[in-house]
């Protein structure tokens, strides 16, 4: 649940780009990490260190500011484990030189009614990754700036 790429991740990404990769998609920490453009032998490459949790989540609650009971791992209630991004990018190749011409991300969030099922308020578990645009206004207002900050300045957020 590390919100920034580790030095080893950056080194691996750099090695992949130096070996000719134009796009490196990393994943694993269950939270968003930055997307950056790197100079490459062919021009420009793109590295997305983590696009968040794209299948499920650990966070039982979505809004920030909840106290974490001592017996729980903080990730269990962290809203960041419900954030994700659908990356959309366009590359252009001109005379063998590569450049990123568009870099956008659709903010995603994971709807998870686990607590409703556990408390008898719902019969079936419903866990879905969906565009943040379909969430409540309060949720969008809280999570959109967090998602934008996590991905970094290179990415423009768009709605789906």
Name each model feature, range by range.
Residues 1-4:
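Short acidic, glycine-rich surface-loop motifs adjacent to enzyme active sites
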Residues 60-160:
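A short C-terminal boundary segment appended to hydrolase-like catalytic domains
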Residues 7-85:
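Conserved beta-sheet core of the metallophosphoesterase superfamily
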